[in-house]
Every structure is written in structure tokens, then in C-alpha cells.
């Protein structure tokens, strides 16, 4: 991990098109601004983790639902024969 020290108003550039700027330094918080193209997803880590967990849960449910649908489809096909 690269650790840098910056003052209010100073920036860090990530590649050619992403800039992270220190906006304010408070007692227990640091406010940063991120300038990035709209094609780049910028999320707080806790939001990213929540989305990741929801995706895992929904993919598990989809497999189960797909298996149930396949079973129903197979039963229906046998009845039609």
C-alpha cells in the first residue's frame, strides 16, 4: 500500500484521468473529492461490500429458482407427451 501525506487543497493523481483532492481535515474525518470519468465506479468501501454481498445472495437464489423452473418445465413436457 502506498501511503502519502497531503495538505488541504493538495491532490493525488491516479492514472491520467482520476484526481483525489483533500477538501477538509476535521477532528475525526477527512473530506476528499474524487474527480473521475463517469465510466469509473467510485464507492465507499462499506457500500461496495454491501453490493457484493447482495450479489452473492441473489446469485444463489437465481440458481435455486432456475433449478425449480427446469424441474417444472420437465414435468410439463412429460405431461404433454
Swiss-Prot record:
GO CC terms for this protein?
Answer: cytosol
> What are this entry's molecular-function GO terms?
mRNA 5'-UTR binding
Q: Name where it's found.
A: Cytoplasm
Assigned keywords, A-Z: Bacterial flagellum biogenesis, Cytoplasm, Repressor, RNA-binding, Translation regulation
Gene3D superfamilies the UniProt entry points to: Translational regulator CsrA
Protein's GO biological process: bacterial-type flagellum organization; mRNA catabolic process; negative regulation of translational initiation; regulation of bacterial-type flagellum assembly; regulation of carbohydrate metabolic process
Family statement drawn from the similarity comment of this UniProt entry: Belongs to the CsrA/RsmA family.
Q: Relate the assembly described in the record.
A: Homodimer; the beta-strands of each monomer intercalate to form a hydrophobic core, while the alpha-helices form wings that extend away from the core.
The job of this chain, per UniProt, is described as: A translational regulator that binds mRNA to regulate translation initiation and/or mRNA stability. Usually binds in the 5'-UTR at or near the Shine-Dalgarno sequence preventing ribosome-binding, thus repressing translation. Its main target seems to be the major flagellin gene, while its function is anatagonized by FliW.
The protein here is known as Translational regulator CsrA
Amino acid at each position: 500500500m502506498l501511503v502519502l501525506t497531503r495538505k488541504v487543497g493538495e491532490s493525488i493523481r491516479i492514472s491520467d484521468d482520476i484526481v483525489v483532492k483533500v477538501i477538509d481535515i476535521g477532528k475525526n474525518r477527512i473530506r476528499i473529492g474524487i474527480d473521475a470519468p463517469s465510466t469509473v465506479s467510485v464507492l465507499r468501501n462499506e457500500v461496495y461490500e454491501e453490493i457484493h454481498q447482495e450479489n452473492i445472495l441473489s446469485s444463489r437464489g437465481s440458481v435455486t429458482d432456475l433449478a425449480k423452473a427446469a424441474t417444472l418445465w420437465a414435468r410439463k413436457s412429460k405431461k404433454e407427451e
